[in-house]
Amino acid sequence: MDRMGAPSEPVWIDQESCRLEDFSRAVEVDTDAGDVPLADEIISKIPVYDGDRVRAVLDDAGAIRAYMAEWATVFRTGPGIVAFRRAFTELDVIDRVTEVLIGIIADEAESATGGGDHFAAAGANSRVWNAHEKLCVADPELFARYNANDLIPLVSRSWLGALFQVTTQVNVVRPGGKAQTCHRDYHMGFQTSQQLKDYPAHIHPVSAALTLQGAIAHCDMPLESGPTKL
């Protein structure tokens, strides 16, 4: 017990510290509509928001803070994910960005400069690393329009606070391509179990709190298309 009477937690953790029963119990928790009153609906335990409704209150600081507080709570103690319909209002921008990115993929494949996908054999899938910079160089005006989105900064600030930094990658998993292995996209998400043993327990959640991952669907993505599984 610590001074406050709470059970003491170990400083060092390893694989034996993790119990599958705890994980199963966590993922089986349902999402209560009362915990996400601003969501338009809940699908597969995921709160879904209407981008138009959020944009309608952009000038209302109190309403926006309420949305951000709800999202932060979802990330911290809820299902860990929020989804948006109509996050973008200019779908032609999405289509144009897609065309530019496809061109970048083709150019990098021809020149063998793309770097490839670290989950599959060379050439099986396609990656565009540092896609933001490459899009900006290829079409600065399109880059600006693509990033003139009100929702992405709000969601990012809800978890990371102000002055966050954005990095983007494109990942194309082709039919027959090897699926990604299970991982967490943050500083400690790709290290081996042996390496992770050198970090005290309190650093693990801190590292996760410093990163937020989002995805923008550029096309219809049914399950058959192999979207990222959460």
Q: What are the roles of these predicted feature ranges?
A:
Residues 2-12, 68-79, 88-230:
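Non-heme Fe(II) oxygenase catalytic core, chiefly the N-lobe of the double-stranded beta-helix
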Residues 1-77:
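Fe(II)/2-oxoglutarate
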